[in-house]
């Protein structure tokens, strides 16, 4: 929807005041007074209001809000939605620029101190809608628990200043967009997507301010207990569907076994409720009360090849419907995949998709999936279904404008294949799985014993304890001495306590840091909390130390054992039962995702798109050996070899890339020869490592990341 072009008369721009701020308690003030305050500005009668988080350096120098890079983005967005900056009141949640290194806690405290000033300022413009840019600003209107990554774009009605309710729509701050943000999620070239989202959100505020009715009306009905009324709701809805020739369908499911990880698996899920919607209204009915006639009515429209069916994630809903006796025929559309095709870097959950296009209040917060009664579940289901149907039109336009029709068709085809793969599952050989488990445990125990023996080596143990005492002393305990040396001595005394014999804990960050430093590894990079980091990418730069190599091998094998071996089958550890992914037929049913930003597939529960290969040096067997084919079947593997590089070679017509593929060369080895001219003279094992290393900058360049 486009706003009408306004008749332009240059307005008189007025400035806000600093009155009301509690500067004495503000962490950004100077001696109880605002430090270079930047007040709001705009016309005496603004159409609507923009509230940012706080002024930056350019704003402080010029004394005006939003005049730096963020301001230029806001101004560009206003031009895009055909609104003049001079017609909008622009201000910030805080008056003063946050000092360098300010924490979110300090920013929130400054916002609270400035809130009386902002309330007084906005009370001059009662009822005017607000675009709140950034989490700090949005939390001032929507509460401290508000998450900008989850709720950006949603409409809230708030009485902020005592003058009555006004519409507030939070959006991602332009500064976050300039850093590559999208308001949730990330990936290549996401700043463009973030800018589009900002424009959508500002346009919604703009249209509401001008009286255009774009609010999402909640036209829903539901039935939890009366079979007669439920059948009547279905009958009336089916009549509307046959007239409209399209509808949306959504399912709510549950799992009646203790395998909680299966709650979102179509292969195990059972129907709890089903929702149907046209663009005008939606219904939701409890599955347990549906009559056979009502089920036949639903089944008839699902099987009608002349009616368009809309789903948000049909990869899940369609297999669930199939398991309950329904056949889905004819055109099938998917709003999740459409959104992925048009906006690949944005979050694709239904609420975020809907709030991008509609002025709608959040409804997901009212019901947590899998919890609550039918009285809570069915309204949630009906809103989901109605949102799916109403998202169809704007998403169809977005896909067309993005020239993403073919991408969407490919995604739909892949989703159907992924749904079949999920339901069918993958057979796992229980005997081979047990062999892998024993082999992994043996190697892990051996590596742990080697590291443990090294810790208690005569030349290292004393240094290790001193380092460990220092690391542990950096975090004070209750009743600890203030003096650091005394605190270290206290920790050393605790280690010598005969009642509590000292144990080396290989999974403790402090123990690992102390051990590696005692071995001479110069670790120094710290986490945000001030601890020395032992992340994989940091340790890999010290892999020439044998202790580091042993630790990395231990961690990798422990992770693989848990993820690809032990989690596949249900196991009992003492009194505790850990349920595995495999069903009663020894099949696992991975959940496949075809809407990753790169276009590659992903899977979970368990991750199955890339079973790790054998590595004798790391003591790692071939984990795919436990995946088997049943008698009379064959196990087939496909690999789109270096597909991204081949596409780039074709699109760019780069002579270097074309020569590689036309002459059947290995692109990774060719790039490795450029970086390491002596690549071909190095040992085979070393060449394998270098070839793997070069893949990171290659794929970083392919997907728009840092090189």
Regions inferred by a protein language model and the residue ranges of each:
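A polyanion-binding, active-site-adjacent surface
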Residues: 2-209
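Short hydrophobic beta-strand that contains or immediately precedes a catalytic carboxylate
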Residues: 49-51, 247-250, 311, 332-333, ...
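Conserved RNase H-like, two-metal-ion catalytic cores of nucleic-acid enzymes
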Residues: 58-59, 63-69, 74, 212-352, ...
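Short active-site oxyanion
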Residues: 64, 126-129, 303-309, 500-502, ...
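Catalytic phosphate/metal-binding cores of nucleic-acid and nucleotide-processing enzymes, i.e., regions
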Residues: 72, 135, 146, 156, ...
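Metal-dependent phosphoesterase core characteristic of DEDDh/y 3'-5' exonuclease domains
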Residues: 142-153, 168, 174-178, 271, ...
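Conserved "right-hand" nucleotidyltransferase catalytic core of DNA-directed polymerases
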Residues: 207-285, 357, 363, 370-619, ...
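Generic long, charged, amphipathic alpha-helical segments
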Residues: 663, 667-689
